[in-house]
Amino acid sequence: MSLLTGYLLGSIPSAYLVTRRLIGRDIRQMGGGNVGGLNTFREVGTGAGISVAFIDLVKGTLAVSVSYYLLTQNAQWVILTGFMAVIGHNWSVWLDFKGGKGLGPAFGAMLFLLPVYGLPQQLGILALLVFIPLALTRNIALATGIALFSLPFLVWYGSHSEFATLISVLLFLMIGGKFVLDNRKSLRDPANRRNLIVDHWKRPDKG
């Protein structure tokens, strides 16, 4: 029940719903086709992108908090529920199993899990690993990539939990793999590869 709850909450297609509501278009047919906050930010607007990012964050936090407070006290099941929320976001049952990259629900789940299981310092370090590179490069892909790569080391150092560390590794591989798969055509072109890696945060000039 806990895992199904995580998946269904994660699968709520916020980027699709917000874009449909605001401009009547399908976000899957816009920009890179990613059903997430960054593509919404770039293709629909700043307010829409921020709204989607916030909703996606809440999906992850809500999934693990519902699991923890209402469904189970078993830490492994709660952590897996957060992981399932990311899977639901990336492969939504409502969008023919298409979706985003999972950053929003992943970080939303961590906002709850790390403090609850005694790792508030790791949450602070993780936040710095996002915001410092983001401030220096304005590159959300690079900043979140650094944070996700560091997550297994932070979790292991703070908890020595093999299970939690394994889930952290799988989370990094899943989100990183989704990024590569979603952008595989663009990554073949050196110019596009540079834009995706260096300028991924910037909104294009709509003219």
Curated annotation (Swiss-Prot):
Its main location: membrane. Keywords: Cell membrane, Lipid biosynthesis, Lipid metabolism, Membrane, Phospholipid biosynthesis, Phospholipid metabolism, Transferase, Transmembrane, Transmembrane helix. The chain crosses the membrane at residues 44-64, 77-97, 112-132, 140-160, 161-181. Its EC number is 2.3.1.275. GO terms for biological process: phospholipid biosynthetic process. It is found in: Cell membrane. InterPro entries: G3P_acylTferase_PlsY (IPR003811). It is a multi-pass membrane protein. It catalyses: an acyl phosphate + sn-glycerol 3-phosphate = a 1-acyl-sn-glycero-3-phosphate + phosphate. GO terms for cellular component: plasma membrane. Catalyzes the transfer of an acyl group from acyl-phosphate (acyl-PO(4)) to glycerol-3-phosphate (G3P) to form lysophosphatidic acid (LPA). This enzyme utilizes acyl-phosphate as fatty acyl donor, but not acyl-CoA or acyl-ACP. Belongs to the PlsY family. NCBIfam families: PRK14416.1 (NF010992). This is Glycerol-3-phosphate acyltransferase 1. It comes from Dehalococcoides mccartyi (strain CBDB1). The lineage of its organism: Bacteria, Bacillati, Chloroflexota, Dehalococcoidia, Dehalococcoidales. The gene is plsY1.
